[in-house]
Amino acid sequence: MNIQFSKMHGLGNDFMVIDNVTQNVFLSKDTISRLADRNFGIGFDQLLMIEPPYDPELDFHYRIFNADGSEVEQCGNGARCFARFVKMKGLTQKRIINVSTAKGKIQLKIEHDGNITVDMGKPILEPAKVPFEAQKEEKTYILRVEDHTVLCGVVSIGNPHCVVLVDDIDNAPVETLGPLLENHERFPNKVNVGFLEIKSRDHARLRVWERGVGETLACGTGACAAAVVGQLQDKLNPHCTIELPGGELRLFWQPGQSVKMTGTADFVFDGQIQI
């Protein structure tokens, strides 16, 4: 099987993007994992699969697979790349694109400056729906990790996130605490872990340990989760900039509303591979 694909990235969070509207591609979990290998494959953080809409009122459906081959519910940086891809490839002429994912519906808007705004939907704070094991909804939760106590915020942006505030992002224990929290027993579906340093009420720095991937240069849903948790803990304003290793995202959220994220999406190259 010969597969046409594109390589794209959002702030360094990189993707293999496959048009499954004009192709008929099925990839096993093992095949995706092999393609994700940066030495022996294409190399990517996630694979995005664009498909025809399941709902006639929507424009597309898209699926997201991590580098380990597992399918996940949502990806903010991937959503921006999705929007640029379908416009660039002539799959749509619309500037406002409505799509479905495994977790629900999102709206993408291609701005006149080329940036893309994603309406990520309302954040989920109810523990059982994240899912997260807790007696009741709190702004801050206490987790026991080995011999340590960790304070964190927990939210779902279509996928689960745990956000830990730190004083110094450059020395945050991302590679040690990240995988421990990812696999913590109170997160039955595992969790993405964000380490957040507040610089001001309008600006914060973030590093993310992504579930099934490891640390990435950027995580769109992680930035959304950080903006929500930062505001719930009275650290951030509704409009704020989240700075990730790969670049900046602009966020807007008010309680009871959808989270809106604006940022870039970059095309790298087109290719084909024989499977």
Curated annotation (Swiss-Prot):
Keywords: Amino-acid biosynthesis, Cytoplasm, Isomerase, Lysine biosynthesis. Pathway: Amino-acid biosynthesis; L-lysine biosynthesis via DAP pathway; DL-2,6-diaminopimelate from LL-2,6-diaminopimelate: step 1/1. It catalyses: (2S,6S)-2,6-diaminopimelate = meso-2,6-diaminopimelate. Its EC number is 5.1.1.7. GO terms for biological process: lysine biosynthetic process via diaminopimelate. The active site is at 75 (proton donor), 219 (proton acceptor). It is found in: Cytoplasm. It holds the Pfam family DAP_epimerase. It is an enzyme of class 5 (isomerase). The record marks 269 as: Important for dimerization. PROSITE patterns: DAP_EPIMERASE. GO terms for molecular function: diaminopimelate epimerase activity. Catalyzes the stereoinversion of LL-2,6-diaminopimelate (L,L-DAP) to meso-diaminopimelate (meso-DAP), a precursor of L-lysine and an essential component of the bacterial peptidoglycan. HAMAP family: DAP_epimerase. Belongs to the diaminopimelate epimerase family. Homodimer. This is Diaminopimelate epimerase. It comes from Psychromonas ingrahamii (strain DSM 17664 / CCUG 51855 / 37). The lineage of its organism: Bacteria, Pseudomonadati, Pseudomonadota, Gammaproteobacteria, Alteromonadales.
